[in-house]
């Protein structure tokens, strides 16, 4: 949620409230800032716990195989999302230099990327956007974002609410061409079967029917359908100067084929939002083709493919979410997925099929192991300190100009600063460079109560 949901989507982030209630019950313990493969191994975890559930999601961009994809201004959406969400493992700066930008893909990630690129910085300030990101967006020269999809309006993967949201962004027009509306029997069948898809088509139609004379905003988001990217074109200096697409046409069943009609679109940057891909976990098998940990209904299996359901099960190791089934579905759709995995875990526990531990079992034993290795781990109590600190940074802004309210928080970006705050250390204005480029705003010192924390992992 912290590094995957756009900062201007507080509605989606409300899932945090439910997670808070669970973590505050006291029967779930958090050990943060611990990397599997660096600080602990899968074998360490299997030795200390009866079962392991892998829920690491998908953090990489799915590859796109077209000429020019490796040009310097060709960016993966996952990297851009990680930057604007303040992921500490990504650079603090982003080269926002292009006036015209292409976004490849017709899912909600493409909408997020397009919206953040087009939105004025002052309209992001009331969110938890990191200070360095807000400052970069303030200097963004962009005027036009072009979103490209291979198929038609009946096949796009936008959800209705996120698509309608584009039309509410201040000083941004959404432009759709009437020429991009075509439906075959497969399309009509898809619309009959899905009320959500009918809502999406209705919203796209409303954008297409808007009076062009009403398009007076300083920034525009253009949605182009039936356009398949075929090449990212470089100038003589090796920088992006254009995107070439091929016009496609419906085949009758909802699929499309190329028509041979090529269009060149002048853009200076390309963002690829064509899907996510999970990263392998050291010590576990990985299906490179599917981008998941091989499993059968959540039980992790040996081998390198999920398709081999006869492969031996690795006792006590399970998977859930995108690392289990691939990057499909939203936060809510993971519930049934998790229930399936947990039902198998409970069944295996009752049948005595879990892994036999070889070390001292439990949380305290793992804490002792981490401390013996010098790992600066953090806890739930430490997260509460960081949460309060970020809210204090937001309060320091006071009222935003133009009646935009107040900042809910300012997200701390640096891993070092997050670790220090979470472990009870004092972080003050002298450490502003660790928190992010705060501009002319002074960074408030940590409240005294942060120094009162004496929980596990406290750094003396």
Label the model's feature ranges:
Residues 16-74, 221-224, 230-244:
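Feature captures the FAD/FMN-dependent oxidoreductase FAD-binding
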Residues 2-4, 11, 15, 111, ...:
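Dinucleotide-binding/catalytic capping subdomain of oxidoreductase cores
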């Amino acid at each position: 949620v912290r590094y995957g949901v756009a900062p201007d989507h507080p509605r989606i982030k409300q899932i945090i409230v439910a997670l808070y209630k669970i973590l505050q019950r006291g029967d779930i313990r958090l050990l943060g800032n611990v990397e599997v493969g660096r600080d602990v191994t899968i074998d360490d975890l299997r030795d200390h716990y009866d079962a392991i559930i892998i829920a690491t999601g998908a953090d990489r961009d799915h590859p796109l195989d077209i000429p020019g994809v490796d040009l310097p201004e060709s960016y993966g959406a996952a990297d851009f999302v990680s930057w604007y969400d303040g992921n500490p493992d990504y650079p603090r700066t982003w080269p926002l230099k292009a006036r015209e930008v292409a976004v490849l893909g017709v899912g909600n990630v493409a909408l997020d990327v397009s919206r953040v690129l087009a939105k004025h910085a002052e309209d992001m300030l009331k969110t938890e956007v990191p200070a360095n990101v807000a400052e970069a967006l303030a200097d963004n020269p962009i005027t036009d974002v072009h979103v490209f999809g291979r198929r038609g309006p009946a096949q796009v993967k936008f959800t209705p609410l996120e698509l309608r949201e584009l039309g509410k962004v201040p000083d941004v027009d959404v432009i759709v061409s009437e020429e991009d509306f075509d439906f075959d029997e497969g399309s009509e069948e898809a619309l009959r079967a899905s009320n959500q898809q009918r809502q999406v088509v209705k919203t796209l139609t409303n954008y297409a029917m808007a009076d062009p004379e009403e398009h007076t905003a300083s920034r525009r988001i253009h949605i182009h359908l039936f356009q398949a990217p075929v090449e990212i074109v470089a100038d003589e200096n090796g920088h992006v100067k254009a995107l070439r697409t091929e016009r496609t046409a419906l085949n009758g069943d909802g699929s499309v084929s190329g028509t041979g009609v090529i269009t060149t679109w002048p853009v200076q940057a390309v963002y690829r939002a064509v899907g996510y891909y999970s990263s392998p976990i050291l010590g576990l098998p990985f299906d490179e083709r599917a981008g998941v940990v091989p499993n059968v209904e959540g039980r992790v299996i040996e081998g390198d493919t999920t398709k081999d359901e006869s492969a031996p099960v690795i006792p006590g190791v399970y998977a859930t979410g995108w690392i289990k089934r691939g990057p499909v579905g939203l936060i809510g759709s993971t519930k049934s997925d998790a229930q399936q995995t947990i039902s198998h875990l409970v069944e295996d526990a009752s049948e005595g099929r879990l892994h036999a531990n070889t070390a001292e079992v439990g949380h305290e034993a793992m804490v002792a192991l981490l401390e013996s290795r010098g790992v600066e781990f953090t806890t739930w109590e430490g997260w509460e300190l960081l949460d309060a600190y970020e809210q204090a940074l937001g309060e320091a802004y006071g009222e935003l100009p133009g009646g935009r309210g107040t900042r809910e928080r300012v997200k701390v970006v640096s891993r070092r600063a997050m670790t220090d705050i979470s472990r009870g250390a004092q972080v003050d204005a002298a450490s502003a460079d660790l928190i992010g480029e705060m501009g002319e705003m002074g960074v408030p010192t940590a409240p005294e109560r942060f120094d009162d924390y004496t929980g596990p992992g406290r750094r003396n």
